[in-house]
Amino acid sequence: LDGTLVHSDLLVESIFLFLKRYPLLFWRLFFWLLKGKANLKRRLAETVAPSAQTLPYNSALVSWLEEQRVAGARLVLATASDLRLADAIASHTAIFDEVLGTQERNLAAGHKREALVSLYGELGYEYVGNSAADLAVWKSASVVHVANPDRGVLARAHALGRTGQVFRQDGSYPRILKRALRLHQWTKNLLLF
């Protein structure tokens, strides 16, 4: 989801949104994190949530996923983001059949791989990712799709020998960064603050 389906990171967006709404309660973030990253994500999702309607979606990937769904593929949104946020995004995009997200434990890297293998078996699923954390998930995927890869990740994905689609960032880096940061939203927020 983060950096793949959307051009931003929901945890970072949630932290900024929390700090904007509750600047004097910044210290809570540290206490929440002391109980683990899953707890931090849960508490942020309970307190603030970025709007699924205004997130900077990867339009090329969304279009491809829509095509896959029409062709009969079962689409599962598996993310390390909090399940509440993932559910909101799945509802907004209306392309996913199932949603897996962080609840009691952070559904990242090896934990995500374990969840997918338990549901679909070894080499029983295709997976779209973008970061080194996705390498663990790709090791058990039948096809490795890559979207907006972090530096060095594409070569490591190719090394697995099962690369499918590669979605590159559409546009120049400054334009992508501006879209991911959603500066126009923060400008409006500053005017309201």
Annotate the PLM regions.
Residues L1-A45:
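Active-site neighborhood of HAD-like aspartate-dependent phosphohydrolases
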Residues H7-E13, A38-P50, Y57-A60, L83-A86, ...:
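Cytosolic catalytic headpiece of P-type ATPases
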Residues A52-F193:
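C-terminal cap/substrate-recognition subdomain and adjoining C-terminal extension
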